[in-house]
Amino acid sequence: MIRITKFRCNSFEELSYLVWAGNACVIIDPGFDSEAEFDALHKAIKENGITPSGILLTHAHPDHVYGVHRLCEEWGIPVYANRGEEVTLGALHALCANLGNSDVEDFSSRIKWIEDGDRIFVSENTACVRKADETGTITGMTGGLEFKVLSTPGHTAGGVCYLCREFRKASASEESKNERDAKERYGSTVASQEADKWKVLFSGDTLFAGCIGRSDLPGGDYTALMQGIFTKLLCLDGGIDVLPGHGPATTISEERMKNPFLQPFNEPYEE
């Protein structure tokens, strides 16, 4: 079962997520900016007996990355981000100064670049990336979390969203069948693992409940934002939960039907 703890962080009320299944664990968009916020994270980690294996960034605006450097130093873990965020990362100090907020310590040496369609597999104390065109098995992983990278620029130049589901190592009797149908069922997902349906979308500042991300900041692009939402997000299964970087959770179906920023493309209400 995927478990998620949400933390409201910093003066922007950014939402950071601790995500785990069994002993597989990651942190998404760690905006922790005070001792109280870090204490809340450490309490949740200790109570659940887990250790983060990586940090996933939807984008690199200050409110989403305040805690990255400290957490990387504490656990020695990598940071996954889209290479398009090099522009945002290069402007971090200026953005912090303009906002009048605390500065962000450099964490560039920890970054592992990801691209659209890549999959990040997380097991206990381990995380690795399978590129979109790679197949084959992942050795040493018996199960955990799988994230699929969806490139959704527009709020920033390298913004992404993450689909999330569990995976487990198939039994010996299942492996041959999985080898045959894994690509058909799961695209480029590794063949010797059996995965669940996608359960959750972490949408960062691309899609919110009843709203969309702003595109008037440096690196923003309204056309790209809308294209990403329509071609990458709204086509997903309607039952997928959407956990954004700010505000309440929603679902793909809710946003298809009710989001006023997506008119006149809303679906009709279902009776």
Question: Where are the regions that the model predicts?
Answer:
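Conserved beta-strand hairpin/beta-sheet module of binuclear metal-dependent hydrolase folds
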Residues: M1-N48, Y162-R168, K199-F202
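Conserved Rossmann-like nucleotide-binding pocket used by diverse enzymes
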Residues: R3, L56, K148
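Short acidic/glycine-enriched loop/turn segments that link adjacent beta-strands
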Residues: S11-E13, I114, H155-G158
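Metallo-beta-lactamase
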Residues: C25, F32-D33, L95, E124-R130, ...
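Active-site HxH/HxHxD metal-binding segment of metal-dependent hydrolases
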Residues: D33-A36, H42-G136, G143-L145, R168, ...
